[in-house]
Each structure stands twice: as C-alpha cells, then as structure tokens.
Amino acid sequence: QYLMYYSVPGYTDKSGIEHGWGIAVAKSTDLVNWERVGEVNADPAATYESKGFAAPCALVVGDTVHLFYQTYGNGRNDAICHAWSTDGITFTRNKTNPVFKPGGDWNCGRAIDAEVIRFKDKYFLYYATRDPEYKIQMQGVAIAPANTSFNRSDWQNMSTTAPILKPELPWEKDCIEGASVIEKNGQLYMFYAGAYNNAPQQVGVATSSDGINWERLFVEPFLTNGEPGTWNESESGHPHIFANPNGDDYLFFQGNKTNGKDW
C-alpha cells in the first residue's frame, strides 16, 4: 500500500470557524487510483500552525513516517516543520518546530516546499525562499547528520551566501520552487517547478553529484503545461518524483485549467 500526502485548502465550517490549509492523506495499491483516507491531525498546541500547514514531504525511516511541511499564511515568517507517525495518519510534532528557516542576506528568511532525501550518509533538506524584495523564488539546501532526530539544532544551512538554483531561463520567469529529488547511480536529479503558479508553471530537471552544486539538464521544460482546453492548460507544476521499489519511477504533478481556481 502507498500513502500520498497533499495540501488541501482552508474552509469555514458550519459554525463559522475558519480553518487554514491542511494536509490530506490518500492510499493506493497501484499508484494510479487513489482513495482519500483522512487528514493529518492538527495540534492545538502548535501555535506556529494556527494559520495552516501545507506542502508535505514524507520520508520513511525504518517503521516511521517523517513528515516535513511548511507553516502557511505567515509571509516572510513561514518555516519548515517536522512531525512523525507510525501509522501514517496521526502525527507527533517535533518539539523544536519550526525546525528550519534560512539566514543570509540573499533571502527574506522564509522557507517553504520542503524536500528531504538521504544522500552520502547525510540528510539534505531542500527548500524554497524569496529574495529580500520578496519577488524572486529560489532554492536553498541544508544538511543534517545521518543520526539526526531532525531537530532544529541538527540542520546546517549550506546556502549561506547564495541560492543553489534561481530562475535564469525565460520559461522560469521569477520562480523556482517545489523541488523533488531522486538518486540514480550516485547522482541526484531534481525535478522543480519553474515560474509561479499559472504563469504557467512547468517542470524542469537539474542534476548534482554532491547535492549542493546543480546543473540543469534541459533548456526547455521537461514537462510543459497543457494545450488550450486540456485539464492542465494553466500549469503543470509542483512535481514529486517517486522511486517505486519495483524499479519504476513515477512523476506526480499538479495542474488545472482555471487559472488556479481549482487544482
């Protein structure tokens, strides 16, 4: 059985109480047909999540699902959090949350769109942030030792003076975000979203041998938005690359044809 974690928008309940963005869980036996089975539990004590939480990355270590996600709705103060679960549904928050936000003059201090992968006996945390003017979205990376508990003190920001990837190609416009990373034969491949949502957002690929220095594989998008009238006319974005233990790789992505009114 496979579990998928994905963002769901906020809503106002029948009592008029507003609920922020959250994370839902779906299950599948074939990676194609999915059934929603619930939502990641909110934690009233986690006041840093009071406006919502979203953009999950799930990492299985032993018999535990580790969830890395972002706070939502706090602008420059949004940061990466960590929680864990043994059933995949009910999660315990890390007491040191938020576990990461970047320093350095090149960014605004924000961190979203977490992606965590173990590589060369370290854990690499990829994140998106913006420039101090809050216009350009870029990618950074932090590392933690192999024996980490994923606490705040374990993460060392490697992007102290510059991003590891920033928009440079015409189709990337003002944004690179939503990185998802896979290892093949000792090489890392990053699938990333170029341009902001519905600009249109499309998917590119970069590669690295050390997890820090990256080079694009293609000048054009690896996965484009759809033709006019198709379901993903407005974008093909926020990718996730999944290495199935049976040997196949699956690329998940979001799309819409309503300029972001739904996904």
Language-model-derived ranges and their functions:
Residues Q1-K51, L59-G109, I117-D174, I182-S234, ...:
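Beta-rich carbohydrate-recognition and catalytic domains
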Residues A114:
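Short tryptophan-centered beta-strand motifs in secreted/extracellular beta-sheet-rich domains
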Residues G178:
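Active-site/pore-lining binding-face segments in mid-to-C-terminal subdomains
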